[in-house]
Amino acid sequence: MFFSSKKCKTVSKTFRGPCVRNA
């Protein structure tokens, strides 16, 4: 996952991918 913790939080709203799974 190349998504940063900060970006994940902001992207998680529109992008529901590995970020939410990792969180």
UniProtKB/Swiss-Prot annotation:
GO BP annotations, alphabetical order:
defense response to bacterium; defense response to fungus; killing of cells of another organism
GO cellular component terms, semicolon-separated: extracellular region
Keywords (alphabetical) are: Antibiotic, Antimicrobial, Cell wall, Fungicide, Plant defense, Secreted
Compartments reported by the entry: Secreted, Cell wall
Give a brief account of the tissues where this protein occurs.
Distributed in the epidermal cell layer of leaves and in the subepidermal layer region of stems. Not in roots.
Q: Which domain of life is it from?
A: Eukaryota
Q: Into which family does the record put it?
A: Belongs to the DEFL family. Group IV subfamily.
Sum up the protein's function in the record's words.
Answer: Antimicrobial peptide. Active against Fusarium spp., Gram-positive and Gram-negative bacterial pathogens.
Tell me the protein's name: Defensin D4
Q: Which organism is it from?
A: Spinacia oleracea
